[in-house]
């Protein structure tokens, strides 16, 4: 047999669909059926083929029904709704021969569903994935929000452009202990850490990082994408080691700080600029901006001095505030 025929025959043992573009393999024995979602939609015809050399005595069942769905090596089903998805199993004489799990990916009015994640609306509308980098090392963190707490599975893949999918490695998604309140509702926060393997911090980026997150809730499949340059998601850690030094014969103090440990080096090349503000109980003083790591301010009783940082030469996001008490 010709090698190409072998490949086609092997695939036909697993699953056939018409049209073939409407169904694809997510992982071994798990398939996504793409459906146009509207009233009286015809759905997709899916032909399941039992992965066995056996020919006779085969029956089919589904976890959605207690009845025998059919007999023979193949089973043809019409997938229109979630009740038609789920796990299909072929048996012979009480023995399980193979299983196939069908998930649904909905498209309404030409738009793929985004029901699983919450739109964070930052830095723009339809921002389901929020990615940040603390420096230019190629390491970044992406997070997302969901109101769903059970039957969830996430998988994240990333690359620099679409030419080399091995260029960026992402770990497993983890549930944060932090709950996020938005629109009068609490959401679970998930994060994932990614690292570009051959990152050069000083090099100009020509291709963006591409991130694809696949989400499965019960029998629903969705995917979310984000594309960015590392320079556009930079958010430094706050300055560290804030210190106050009283000035002689003056109501002012000198506040000093250091670059965060996580920031790229050398600092002479990767420079930060800083914002300093005195925050009292009832008001906030005017902000002071400096490229130095110290500043002179008037420190009122019961006030705090706070400092934040961002990239000096590229308008990155400002860091969170670091603060020290005046008292």
Curated annotation (Swiss-Prot):
Ig-like C2-type domain sequence ranges: 23-106
Per the record, its GO cellular-component terms are:
extracellular space; interleukin-12 complex; membrane
Asked if Disulfide bond is a keyword of the record, the answer is: yes
Pfam families xref list: IL12p40_C (PF10420)
Location in the cell: Secreted
What would be an example GO MF term here?
interleukin-12 alpha subunit binding
Xref: CDD domains: FN3 (cd00063)
Provide the glycosylation site positions.
223
GO biological process terms, semicolon-separated:
positive regulation of mononuclear cell proliferation; type II interferon production
Please verify whether the record's keywords include Transmembrane: no
SMART domains assigned to the protein according to its UniProt record, in alphabetical order: IGc2
Q: List the disulfide bonds.
A: 50-90
* Subunit record text: Heterodimer with IL12A; disulfide-linked. The heterodimer is known as interleukin IL-12. Heterodimer with IL23A; disulfide-linked. The heterodimer is known as interleukin IL-23. Also secreted as a monomer. Interacts with NBR1; this interaction promotes IL-12 secretion.
**Function (record text):** Cytokine that can act as a growth factor for activated T and NK cells, enhance the lytic activity of NK/lymphokine-activated killer cells, and stimulate the production of IFN-gamma by resting PBMC.
Return the similarity comment.
Answer: Belongs to the IL-12B family.
PANTHER family (alphabetical): INTERLEUKIN-12 SUBUNIT BETA (PTHR48485:SF4), INTERLEUKIN-12 SUBUNIT BETA-RELATED (PTHR48485)
Protein name as catalogued: Interleukin-12 subunit beta
């Amino acid at each position: 047999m010709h090698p190409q025929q072998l490949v086609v025959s092997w695939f036909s043992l697993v699953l056939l669909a018409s049209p073939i573009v409407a169904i694809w393999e997510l992982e071994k024995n798990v398939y996504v059926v793409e459906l146009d979602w509207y009233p009286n939609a015809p759905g997709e015809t899916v032909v399941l083929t039992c992965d066995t050399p056996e020919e006779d005595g085969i029956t089919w069942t589904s976890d959605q029904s207690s009845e025998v769905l059919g007999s023979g090596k193949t089973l043809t089903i019409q997938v229109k709704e979630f009740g038609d998805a789920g796990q299909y199993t072929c048996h012979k004489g009480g023995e399980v021969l193979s299983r196939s799990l069908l998930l649904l990916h909905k498209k309404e009015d030409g738009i793929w569903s985004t029901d699983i994640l919450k739109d964070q609306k930052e830095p723009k509308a339809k921002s389901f994935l929020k990615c940040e980098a603390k420096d230019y090392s190629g390491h970044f963190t992406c997070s997302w929000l969901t109101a769903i707490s059970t039957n969830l599975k996430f998988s994240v893949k990333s690359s620099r452009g679409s030419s080399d999918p091995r260029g960026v490695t992402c770990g497993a998604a983890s549930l944060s202990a932090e709950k996020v309140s938005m629109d009068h509702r609490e959401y679970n926060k998930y994060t994932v850490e990614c690292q570009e393997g051959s990152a050069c911090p000083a090099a100009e980026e020509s291709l963006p990082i591409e991130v694809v997150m696949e989400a499965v809730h019960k029998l629903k499949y969705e995917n979310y994408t984000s594309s960015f340059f590392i320079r556009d998601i930079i958010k430094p850690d706050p300055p560290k080691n804030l210190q106050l030094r009283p000035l002689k014969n003056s109501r002012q103090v000198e506040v000093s700080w250091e670059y965060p440990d996580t920031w790229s080096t050398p600092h002479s090349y990767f420079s930060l600029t800083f914002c300093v503000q005195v925050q009292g109980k009832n008001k906030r003083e005017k902000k002071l901006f400096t490229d130095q790591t110290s500043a002179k301010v008037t420190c009122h009783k019961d006030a705090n001095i706070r400092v934040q940082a961002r990239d000096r030469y590229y308008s990155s996001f400002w860091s969170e505030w670091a603060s020290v008490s005046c008292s």
